[in-house]
Amino acid sequence: MMNSRWQANKIGLINFWYYDEQEFPFVKGRMLLRGSNGSGKSVTMQSVVPLLLDGNMSPERLDPFGSRDRKMSSYLLEEDDGREERTGYLYLELKRQNSDTYLTIGMGIRARRGKNLDKWYFSLTDGRRIGKDFFLYKDSGEKVTLSKKELENRIWDGGRVIDR
């Protein structure tokens, strides 16, 4: 009997924390992150996987040590980076075992100084893959992340975009 379970295949971050665009692959549903203490392994995983599965952005949930010091907006706008706004994306690509069938869930976040976060969630259900045949940014010499409306237009009927 063929095993048709879904497995995590990769996670991706675009314009999030220290990452302009980064993917972390899984092998057989598992991932190993290596690095020295304080290099960001826990923060990276804490901010992606639980957040995509339940949408809980409370500060103590985002900080691997349980403090309330880091808010989601600080992962997009650092205090001294000079930006007034930034849109970022997080996503998790799933792959059906023994198949070339893919499903992606993700989240877009727009941070603006002094304002509440805008956030939206999306799924790609038609097999398109981020970084292969679907991109979360426009590339016109400079990569500019898609707005929520641009994402809706690009996904079209191959998935969904929803607000929480």
Predicted feature residues:
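Extreme N-terminal "head/tail" segments of very large remodeling/mechanoenzyme assemblies
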Residues: M1-R164
